[in-house]
Amino acid sequence: MTGSDISHILKEGELEKRSDNLLQFWKRKTCVLTTDSLNIYTDQQKKNKSKELKLQSIKKVDCVEHTGKFVYFTIVTTDNKEIDFRCSDEKNCWNAVIAIALVNFQNRKAIQGFKTQKESENTSLGQQERCMARAP
């Protein structure tokens, strides 16, 4: 990914996050999912960002459970940290949108890596051809 890539907002709204402390209370957070991160705010005005989860640091969206009132899911990071979330109804749930954003991000990253590899190979071949042309 390059610095010139622009992050577009994919979803915005409220999500509940389980706290990391011993009591593990559910706290309502304002969240913004972009093409490269999930931003979690402590306030609805989005002035106080409490956490930014870059999609490159997310391994998977896991443990989806539907109850009568909530849909629960877990985001697993690349360092195997688990962050639990829940949303109030299936129609407004985030797990599928986050999973699709993650797949799209990984695809863009793979394509960029492939292009970089091909450019490197082409540069290397061009240098070899120039050396061969100069040889007696």
UniProtKB/Swiss-Prot annotation:
Question: Where's the PH domain?
Answer: 9-103
Q: How does it sit in the membrane?
A: Peripheral membrane protein
Coarsely, its chief localization is: cytoplasm
Matching entries from InterPro entries are given as:
PH-like_dom_sf, PH_domain, PHLA1/2/3
Query: What is this protein's function?
Result: Plays a role in regulating placenta growth. May act via its PH domain that competes with other PH domain-containing proteins, thereby preventing their binding to membrane lipids.
What family does the Swiss-Prot or TrEMBL record give for this protein?
Answer: Belongs to the PHLDA2 family.
Q: What is this protein called?
A: Pleckstrin homology-like domain family A member 2
